[in-house]
Amino acid sequence: GVVRTLDDFREAHDPTYKILAPTTVYSRDLKPAKRYLITAAQNATPVHKVWWRGLQTMTKKLGAELLVIPMRYKNPTSQWSGSQQNAEHWATEVRPFLWNVRHPLNANLTVLADLKVQPTMSSPLSGAEAVSLESSGIIGHTKLQLRSIPTAPGRMAKLLTTSGACTEANYTDSRAGRIGEFHHSLSAILVEVDGKRFHLRPVHFDAKTASCTDLDTRYTAKGSGRAPRPLALVMGDTHVDAICPLVEKATFGEGGIVETLNPQHLIWHDLLDSYSVNPHHAGNPFNAVAKRQTGTDDAKAEVQRAIEFVRKRTTKDTFSVIVGSNHNDMLRRWIVSNDWRRDPVNAEFYLETALAMVRGTKLTGKGTEYPDPFAYWFRLANVPNSRVLDLDESFMLGGVALDMHGNEGPNGSRGSIHNLRRIGVKSIIGHGHSPGTDEGCDQAGTSTRLKLEYNSGPSSWLNSHVVLHADCKRQHIFIIEGEWRA
């Protein structure tokens, strides 16, 4: 017959083509709640029994509403019989919790359950940055990915994250299927709502311990209890002289993150701000005037403040690790390029530092090597239970690399979460001030105020840390208006 429409053409030329029935709407009368657990389930696929029971434990203990976002995937090679007979078939356990409509959890966070994304999509958040408008958003997907999205000046950056899954990995015997299976994450997003404010944290199932950890609590199929001490707290870039007082209190104050979680290690990125010797101020007389008026042009005093900040916050049973960072390195850049004769305020400190660097300079097989000036002064201060890492010095805990700041990428390129996500080991970095999760890499945010002199315009900066739990799972902790949990 005559082909009249696109559907006629497809049906005539593609024997596998069929017009799908209208989408079934899954929702229920959802009462406003303080906490929500959000995950995803693949069609015609069983739940992971132990993880599902752990989710039930969390739901009960936290008094949370559980939302399971349904995902469709055609898999003719599925090991589970009949998986392709009905695209609308879901495991019995998840059916009462299915949710596939768009729904605001509060004024600033929306569940984008109507956004259907294939489980094998390598970047499930791609293109969805504006879908939720000014609201943060959660998208159902088996691969965990998180981004901080820039917003207009004067507004807090928004978060976009996927949910992780509660069902077993069930992918085709293909390249895309194998990659999808590799990134399949048994996880969920825990949301705490407090008026217009919300707190959002990913929770990961750990097969070795058959549990998941949220902050200081471990959940299993049988119950909950105190979680073991985390291996480390990787803090958003510190910049001591520019640190936000609310973030400092939330992190180190009474009832704060460090007191509550009691991490074994504190990992410091951009500890030193180097405002006194910032190379970007060169030639700007107004920066010089402002610094002279406030005494913030004294490099030695700034270095000492940074060192003492660590000393006062490193307890007897905690170990501090200072990661080599680009702002710490500004001290070296100042020594290399500046003339002490033109800087009487810092002349003595400059000469003393330069002399130590000269005495430590040597020519090796790699080329010229000389001491890092900030590392030199930090070691000279003898801060107990602390260590400052040299350039390219490895430091790993639980199989996760914690030694990279994030400013340097592969083969001399500029670093980013994107080009550090596939280097063969998991990692937690800083540098960008914009929190994120992308495959093997997590990026902490910043501990500074969210608006500084060098981030004008739309910004994706957020105050956040990343905790490395005892089970080696990583979890973002966001500090919103001085609060880190509801």
Q: What positions do the PLM features span?
A:
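Extended recognition/assembly regions associated with phosphoester-bond processing machinery
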Residues: 1-486
